A protein has these predicted regions:
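N-terminal Rossmann/SDR dinucleotide-binding element
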Residues: 1-76
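Glycine-rich Rossmann NAD(P)(H)-binding loop
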Residues: 6, 174-180, 201-212, 233-246, ...
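NAD(P)H-binding glycine-rich loop region in Rossmannoid oxidoreductase-like domains
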Residues: 56-103
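Conserved Rossmann-fold NAD(P)-dependent oxidoreductase catalytic core, especially the SDR/UDP-sugar
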Residues: 80-82, 106-146
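Active-site helix of classical SDR
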Residues: 146, 150-153
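NAD(P)-dependent short-chain dehydrogenase/reductase
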Residues: 159-210, 214-222, 254-255
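Mid/C-terminal beta-alpha module of Rossmann-like enzyme folds, strongest
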Residues: 190, 196, 220, 227-275
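Conserved C-terminal active-site "lid" loop/helix of NAD(P)H-dependent oxidoreductases
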Residues: 214, 248, 269-303
Length: 310
């Protein structure tokens, strides 16, 4: 397929583009900045440079912008993968929901009008398990944050205009991915602590979450993407699921796998969690069959260890 992909500088975007390209698809990636060098030398910049080698990059080309629309006017696109989202201060209570939604959906009507010229084209939107109503869990499935609200609103807007334009829509809902090329989050904290010989302190061990290898998530994304243009029911959704367990148990799983591969002690302590600012349970609902996708769990653990081994 000829694929146009937004949001390729992100951790999951990098993995999705990599696996789409490996599957033989022609991928055009769009970036908001004017060059790969403009993303710097941190892990995000490294991802951008690697993505640029695996795809055909379009710089200074945000979703819905004039260059973006011009590309759609002149090129045949079979699948538009809208993975980009405004994540500015996404963990902050002051996150600007309205601004984020506007950025995420700018020009969406014109985008879909141009996309619909190919009668077999589809839109694949990335969602988050942190949106209100997504996945399964506790407390009535509220949004985790203003960012989660913005993602749900983005999905609603895209669904409305896809119906109006007659463009099939797929929603791929992401849980908690981890793996090589990740940003500094929970898994990264544990791995850095253990590589330094420190005892990791887990402050929220009681939260039940859905952690999944990025390599497995990406294969699930490719399978979903390949099936989407052939859909005739207008809308499809998948909520891929990995390791469903409390964060303390996931830390134990990670520690066991890394002890086998690194020689580190991988010590950690779980605090007694008394505050629950987020829903206690939030998980996805569609377990991914890695064997059917040709995925090797042991290899995935090996590559994670290699990524963090000096």
């Amino acid at each position: 397929m000829n694929i146009l992909f937004t949001g390729a500088s992100s951790f999951t975007g990098y993995w999705f583009v990599t696996k789409l390209a490996e599957a033989g698809h022609e991928v055009r990636t769009t970036f908001t900045r004017d060059s790969a060098e403009a993303y710097g030398d941190d892990v995000r910049g490294q991802r951008v440079r690697r993505v640029a080698e695996r795809s055909k990059p379009l710089f200074s080309c945000p979703f819905g912008s004039a260059p973006f629309l011009e590309y759609l006017k002149n090129e045949r696109v079979d699948l538009l993968c809208h993975h980009a989202a405004d994540v500015t201060d996404y963990k902050s209570p002051a996150f600007d929901i309205c601004s984020a939604v506007a950025n995420n959906t700018r020009g969406v009507q014109e985008v879909l009008k141009l996309l619909s010229r190919n009668s077999k084209a589809a839109l694949l939107l990335t969602g988050s398990v942190f949106e209100g109503g997504e996945g399964a869990g506790s407390e009535g499935l509220p949004a985790f944050s203003p960012y989660g609200v913005s993602k749900a609103a983005t999905a609603d807007i895209c669904a409305y205009y896809c119906r109006a334009a007659g463009v099939p829509l797929g929603k791929f809902v992401i849980p908690n991915p981890f793996g090589p090329w990740e940003d500094a989050r929970f898994t990264g904290y544990l791995m850095r602590a253990w590589s330094n010989g420190d005892v990791a302190n887990i402050r929220t061990p009681a939260y039940v979450r859905d952690n999944i290898h990025a390599s497995l998530l990406a294969l699930a994304y490719v399978a979903f993407a390949e099936a989407l243009p052939a859909t005739n029911d207008g809308f499809r959704r998948t909520n891929p699921s990995g390791y469903v367990e409390c964060q303390g148990a996931f830390a134990g799983r990670l520690a066991q796998e890394m002890r086998l591969r690194t020689g580190w002690e991988c010590r950690f302590e779980c605090a007694r969690q008394t505050e629950f600012d987020e829903p206690r349970i939030r998980i996805n609902t569609d377990p991914v069959n890695g064997v059917a996708l040709g995925w090797d769990e042991a290899v995935a653990w090996n590559k994670l260890a290699q990524w963090y081994t000096p």
